[in-house]
Curated annotation (Swiss-Prot):
Species name: Salmonella schwarzengrund (strain CVM19633)
Name of the protein in question: Glyoxylate/hydroxypyruvate reductase B
Gene giving rise to this polypeptide: ghrB
Enzyme class: oxidoreductase
GO MF annotation: an example: NAD binding
Function field: Catalyzes the NADPH-dependent reduction of glyoxylate and hydroxypyruvate into glycolate and glycerate, respectively.
Quaternary state and interactors: Homodimer.
HAMAP family in alphabetical order: 2_Hacid_dh_C_GhrB (MF_01667)
Family: Belongs to the D-isomer specific 2-hydroxyacid dehydrogenase family. GhrB subfamily.
Principal location class: cytoplasm
Amino acid sequence: MKPSIILYKTLPDDLLHRLEAHFTVTQVPNLHPETVARHAQAFSSAQGLLGASETVNRALLEKMSALRAASTISVGYDNVEVDALTARKIVLMHTPAVLTETVADTVMALMLATARRVVDVAERVKAGEWTESIGPAWFGVDVHHKTLGIVGMGRIGMALAQRAHFGFTMPVLYHARRRHQEAEDRFNARYCDLDTLLQEADFVCVILPLTAETRHLFGATQFARMKSSAIFINAGRGPVVDENALIAALQNGEIYAAGLDVFEQEPLSVDSPLLNMSNVVAVPHIGSATHETRYNMMACAVDNLIDALQGKIEKNCVNPQAAG
């Protein structure tokens, strides 16, 4: 008899068939309490859980007494209570490697869009404001040869440093929990403390997960340390930044512009002051959102769950100690 799993994300037919070859699959739209109650038997007997974005917490786990493995279609897992999974000997799998290059492309796009004011001037053209040769009011700033500061030198940080160093001849500064010798050797990146990075960088790019230590890591003090010409990019997690402090820094001219893929509350409220600022490029958490990469993430998550329920957790496991 096949193990049973709960699938709370729509998959392409070929990936669904791959799952069905190994498991009895119950598809649900979400993990809301009413959904769990409606499918109580399926949840209580499920050994696997696969999907994205929904909260996986102790209350849910209490309804899933047979659960052995959860697989998230993401690299981040701040919506999952990992400690609760580990305490119940449930492994959590994620998809860290397949989205690296795509997210780095998104960060580079935000850097270019903010510096060259692409969104702002494009909207002005559409509004019929281009009636004569443009002047300084339409100008942006250069990207090439500017100093890039990367906060969080993981896979994505490395991919961004590669683009900046080789493609735009940008000096690279970085701040991370530990020094990254490969970044220093390949890109001549310079490790520094956060304050030094903020003071010297023309672009401050945040690529951090959300943890107790990183929540509101960027607030009024940090923005005050940045150059008034600096551009701030957040492609990590929204709550890493105190959004009110960011808004104030932009309004007060403490920094030049911001490119934001993530926010404290998502979706972003329609009355957010960020949406009325011409020097802000706000996009809806599209870091990995290409057809190719999202398919690859789903395929990776499927394979992760198959492997995990066969006891294979050598790669992509967040909490391997749970299997011990």
